[in-house]
């Protein structure tokens, strides 16, 4: 059985740095999929990241730094919570290009797509 739960409390922002007490992942979980909103790329950390100060600290930059696909991937890799990545809100050629650049930074399987449009593609 599979249950997907989006309950990370990111205040509707596409990117997030997790506090030390989260995410709460049950011991029984055999698969953890990190979900990243591609719409966070191209905006400053301050405007697109929940816990922007922590996100900037993890990245070693300031909150006015513009998020690149590589930077977003670096934070997900640094936190190390998931063994799969789903890049969501990929709805244009530019989004796909950014998603591919992000996927290149991961060693785990990556899927990109749009839950809203019901489409996805395996990037690796």
Residue locations for each model-derived region?
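Conserved catalytic-core segment of NTP-binding enzymes
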Residues: 1-2, 8-109, 116-118, 122-124
């Amino acid at each position: 059985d599979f249950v997907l739960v989006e309950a990370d409390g990111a205040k509707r922002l596409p990117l997030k740095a997790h506090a030390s007490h989260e995410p709460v992942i049950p011991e029984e979980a055999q698969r953890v999929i990190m979900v990243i909103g591609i719409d966070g790329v191209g905006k400053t950390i301050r405007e697109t990241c929940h816990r922007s100060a922590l996100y900037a600290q993890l990245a070693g930059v300031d909150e006015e730094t513009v998020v690149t696909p590589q930077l977003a991937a670096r934070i997900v890799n640094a936190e190390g919570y998931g063994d799969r990545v789903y890049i969501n809100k990929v709805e244009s050629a530019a989004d796909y290009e950014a998603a591919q650049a992000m996927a290149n930074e991961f060693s785990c399987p990556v899927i990109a797509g749009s839950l809203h449009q019901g489409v996805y593609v395996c990037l690796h």
